[in-house]
Amino acid sequence: MHAYICTACGTQYPPSESSPARCTICEDERQFVPLGGQGWTTLEAMRLRHFNAWRQHEPGLIGIGSQPTFAIGQRALLICTPNGNVLWDCISLIDDATVTLINGLGGLKAIAISHPHFYTTLGEWSRAFGGIPVHLTPTTGAGSCGPTPASSCGRARR
């Protein structure tokens, strides 16, 4: 079984024998279903074709984005503070190099998701950093959240 990722928006879905028939994020009025239909990949396949690039915007604020660009080109922001680091939004690709670099900067204390287009692989990110909480705003809580460490969306999860 594979946890399929929508190639249009980057959202990961729970493991299944075959790719989902549709993507609820792409069917939302704020997104679109590609003219050619939904496309799907897996995290394992992404790791063979993509890598994460880092850009320091200012001290304590680092942008992380996948290259070549994937889905709608999301980027996450790593906010580094003396009280712990927070990842603002997620990107689909999480790999060993990214986990190693973030751990070298002090690890992660929490993840905050601002919009459904950043659900991506939030469960994978949480698990990679010890099951840290994922905070969703009330407006981002509806819809598919993919394979996550908790059973429901719309509130902080551990």
Task: Tell me the role of every PLM-derived stretch.
Residues 18-21, 74, 123-124:
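Generic recognition of short, well-ordered alpha-helical segments
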Residues 12-13, 76, 100-102:
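Short, flexible, glycine/charge-rich loop motifs used to bind or transfer phosphoryl groups or to couple energy/partner
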Residues 98-158:
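Active-site HxH/HxHxD metal-binding segment of metal-dependent hydrolases
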Residues 12-15, 29-33, 71, 95-96, ...:
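Active-site environment of divalent metal-dependent phosphoester hydrolases
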Residues 2, 19, 57, 72, ...:
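Residue-level preference for short coil/turn positions at secondary-structure junctions
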Residues 2-60, 64-66:
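N-terminal juxtadomain amphipathic helix
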Residues 41-42, 95, 137:
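Helix N-terminus capping/helix-initiation residues
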Residues 50-98:
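Conserved beta-strand hairpin/beta-sheet module of binuclear metal-dependent hydrolase folds
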